[in-house]
């Protein structure tokens, strides 16, 4: 188990985040295709499927997590809808976008977090 022996909520979230970020390759396609289990088995997924996996893993160990959605401008110039995860840690929501190794728990570097269009948060991703 990835979080065995880890006690703090933040450290558990970080361990799960790093697993998905570092072990699940990014693949470009729209909407959820594989879901959490399929993404884990295949070892790759888009933002939706990577988020599905991370949220499922978080909830399986008792962490509170949800899906965040928006239209984001990436550092590559791509301007597109995107999905990432938010963990509830220490009384606040902390971002977690596992689609880039440049990102860390609470820090997104692969798209402009100051100019995205918020499209809401979800307990269950609608697509």
Indicate residue ranges for each PLM-predicted region.
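Secondary-structure boundary elements
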Residues: 1-45, 53-55, 120-127
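Detector for Asparagine
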Residues: 7, 31, 46, 103, ...
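Short phosphate-coordinating micro-motif centered on Lys-Gly-acidic
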Residues: 49
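Hydrophobic/aromatic-rich core segments of domains that either
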Residues: 52-127
């Amino acid at each position: 188990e990835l979080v065995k022996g880890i006690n703090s909520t933040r450290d558990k979230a970080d361990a799960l985040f790093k697993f998905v970020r570092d072990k699940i390759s990014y693949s470009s396609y729209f909407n959820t295709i594989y879901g959490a289990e399929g993404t884990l088995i295949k070892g790759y997924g888009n933002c939706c499927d990577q988020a599905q996996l991370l949220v499922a893993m978080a909830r399986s160990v008792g962490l509170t997590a949800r899906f965040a959605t928006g239209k984001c401008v990436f550092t590559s110039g791509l301007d597109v809808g995107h999905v990432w995860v938010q963990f509830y840690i220490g009384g606040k929501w902390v971002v977690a976008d596992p689609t880039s190794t440049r990102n860390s728990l609470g820090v997104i570097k692969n798209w402009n977090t100051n100019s995205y269009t918020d499209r809401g948060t979800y307990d269950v991703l609608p697509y």
